């Protein structure tokens, strides 16, 4: 079901502004019926940080090829692949500055799939999202029949949105249940314990003081020992724990956060680049330029020019 009339949005503008210091992405759902389908494309050099969310996500690779980062794993994905992301897993879609990538992303809260049936049955439907172990195969590749079926059902859901009538909501739930069944059947041999979800939440709670420190003090020098102290851990334990939980070192996460702030500020032509570098915690404009280019793929000046055109 290829369709040239989808409303494609830039991945960066659609994703990055909704990510806070903890890397939590807030999605603009219709709260009365929290499910949405978006059509996204890569638009030049951009940095999208590792992020996590409480909702569930299914990505269809519409065109191009890239890597999906899930924590510290880089998973190749190409046109026709599916990507399945559960709650509270740090992840992002990576792409080269000049690569043409289009994705179709369906995000939904689990209550959409719950309709009064026995709790055990509902959990089976959602189990591919709720029990993703560290080696879980998030990318479904070389299964074109499955990918085609899921993509076509996602498009059907999109056509029913916004689902403001009973008939439309019944249609969306029916199509979603069909998708969930297809994924459950595919992942039957990979489903682990549901206790994994609670374990992940506990790990993230232990890191909350570090994220709070980052949000409040990113304009100032922050050392690993400062974040470790905030979390009541030794520096060595904190570094290992942070990397295991988030997928990046604390220093890399802090740098990405600062550069993400800089990207936003560069869209305002009134603020000098030298001032922006200081506002996001860099003492040297030249070093800021080096780091920005390494992470974003272009210089701050060129990024500003492209953003304002």
What are these regions (language model features)?
Residues 36-53:
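Conserved short histidine dyad/triad with adjacent acidic residue
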Residues 72-86:
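Short acidic-glycine-tyrosine-enriched beta hairpin
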Residues 123, 147, 151, 169, ...:
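Short, structured helix-loop boundary elements
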Residues 141-196, 209:
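An amphipathic alpha-helical interaction segment
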């Amino acid at each position: 079901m290829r369709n040239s009339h989808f409303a494609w949005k830039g991945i960066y503008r659609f994703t990055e502004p909704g990510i806070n210091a903890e890397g939590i992405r807030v999605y603009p759902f219709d709260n009365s019926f929290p499910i949405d389908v978006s059509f996204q494309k890569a638009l030049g050099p951009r940095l999208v940080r590792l992020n996590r969310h409480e909702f569930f996500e299914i990505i269809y690779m519409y065109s191009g090829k890239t890597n999906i980062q899930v924590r510290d794993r880089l998973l190749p994905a190409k046109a026709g692949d599916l990507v399945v992301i559960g709650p509270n897993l740090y992840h992002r879609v990576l792409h080269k500055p000049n690569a043409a990538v289009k994705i179709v992303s369906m995000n939904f809260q689990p209550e959409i799939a719950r309709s009064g049936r026995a709790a055990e049955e509902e959990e089976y439907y959602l189990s591919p999202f709720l029990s993703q172990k560290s080696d879980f195969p998030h990318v479904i590749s070389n299964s074109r029949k499955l990918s085609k079926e899921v993509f076509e059902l996602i498009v059907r859901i999109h056509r029913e949105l916004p689902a403001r009538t009973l008939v439309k909501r019944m249609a969306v739930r029916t199509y979603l249940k069909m998708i969930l069944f297809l994924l459950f059947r595919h992942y039957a041999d990979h489903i682990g314990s549901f206790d994994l979800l609670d374990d992940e939440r506990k790990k993230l709670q232990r890191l909350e003081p570090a994220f709070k420190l980052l949000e409040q003090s990113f304009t100032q020098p922050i050392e690993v020992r400062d974040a470790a102290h905030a979390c009541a851990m030794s520096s060595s334990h904190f570094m290992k724990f942070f990397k295991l939980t988030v997928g990046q070192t604390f220093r890399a996460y802090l740098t990405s956060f600062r550069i993400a702030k800089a990207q936003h500020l560069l869209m305002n032509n009134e603020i000098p680049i030298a001032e922006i570098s200081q506002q996001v915690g860099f003492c040297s404009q030249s070093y800021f330029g080096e780091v920005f280019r390494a992470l974003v793929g272009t210089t701050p000046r060129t990024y500003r020019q492209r953003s304002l055109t």
